[in-house]
Design a protein with these regions (language model features):
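Short flexible coil/turn linkers enriched for glycine and charged/polar residues
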Residues: 22, 112, 159-162
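RNase H-like nuclease fold core
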Residues: 133-167
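Residue-level detection of the helix-turn-helix DNA-binding "recognition helix"
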Residues: 44, 123, 134, 138
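Short, conserved DNA-binding cores of transcription-related domains
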Residues: 1-83, 88-89
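Short, amphipathic alpha-helical "recognition" segments used to contact nucleic acids or chromatin
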Residues: 98-113
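Short, Lys/Arg-enriched anionic-surface-contact patches
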Residues: 82-102
Length: 167
């Protein structure tokens, strides 16, 4: 649709098909530019679309207006695995109703204020904000743990290298 809108959205292989505004909300209908997806089990590409069910997810606000993205949730059939899989998306976690960047934004806002305050500002329930906060916390904790263990492994390897290297 609009190259500037696509550039602002910053999602790979996605274009904005249409844009609508209603009350204080913006709705962007997205379309994927790629016709295939990678199977989650065998990692092979499949272009055999089984079904397409659009869903509505919330994204960061645009100019102070609540923003929703209507995205196609595509399910493909993999001939190698003989099974169906739902396309994974880089901008949202599986089973979530919000973009990753919106969830990260909410997580940061809660750290600066409180769940109650963010709940009022974003017009989401306390339970929703708390669930998003816990989800983001778990992701960050897992990521920090992986980074810590990778760092420890590197340090361990460096110590071994200095012990075995000739001086």
């Amino acid at each position: 649709m609009d190259i500037q809108l696509d550039a602002l959205l910053k999602f790979p292989h996605v274009t904005v098909e249409s844009c609508a505004q209603q009350d204080n909300e913006v709705y962007l209908k997205l379309r994927f530019l790629n016709e295939e997806a990678r199977c989650l089990r065998c990692e092979k590409l499949s272009s055999e679309l089984h079904q397409n069910r659009p869903i509505l997810i919330r994204d960061l606000s645009i100019f102070g207006q609540v923003t929703y993205l209507k995205i196609p949730r595509r399910q493909f059939y993999c001939h190698d695995c003989q099974g169906y899989f739902t396309e994974s998306l880089t901008f949202m976690d599986a089973g979530r109703q919000y973009t990753r960047r919106y969830e990260e934004h909410l997580y940061q806002q809660v750290q600066l204020s409180s769940i109650e305050q963010v709940s009022r500002v974003e017009r989401l329930s306390f339970d929703r904000i708390e669930g998003i906060f816990k989800h983001q916390y778990a992701l960050k904790k897992k990521q920090d743990g992986q980074e810590s263990s990778a760092l420890a492994l590197m340090k361990s390897a460096n110590v071994k290298d200095t012990k075995t290297s000739p001086q």
